[in-house]
């Protein structure tokens, strides 16, 4: 798993109540990326993603658009540690 990378992201905008989490799970699983996504109490969405660099980059690019009905104003991304226990992508 040495060629894998991990990131944490915070998505700002109209991202709750628009199926952002369910859509991100679907996209992450399609890409073969592991991690999780959750609603935050302040109205943002947080996520972690890990896998091959190109696939993680693709999911981050998707998060900047989001699903139909979402309005993404900003996405903050920071590097994270790969979690070898995280084998799938899920809603938390």
Which residue stretches match the model-derived regions?
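Intrinsically disordered, low-complexity, mixed-charge
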Residues: 1-92
């Amino acid at each position: 798993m040495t060629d894998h990378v991990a990131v944490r992201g915070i998505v700002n905008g109209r991202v709750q109540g628009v199926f952002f989490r369910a859509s991100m799970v679907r996209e992450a699983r399609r890409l073969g990326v592991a991690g999780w996504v959750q609603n935050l109490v302040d109205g943002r969405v947080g996520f972690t993603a890990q896998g091959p660099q190109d696939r993680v980059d693709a999911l981050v690019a998707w998060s900047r658009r989001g699903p139909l009905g979402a309005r993404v104003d900003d996405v903050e991304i920071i590097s994270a540690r790969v979690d070898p226990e995280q084998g799938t992508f899920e809603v938390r």
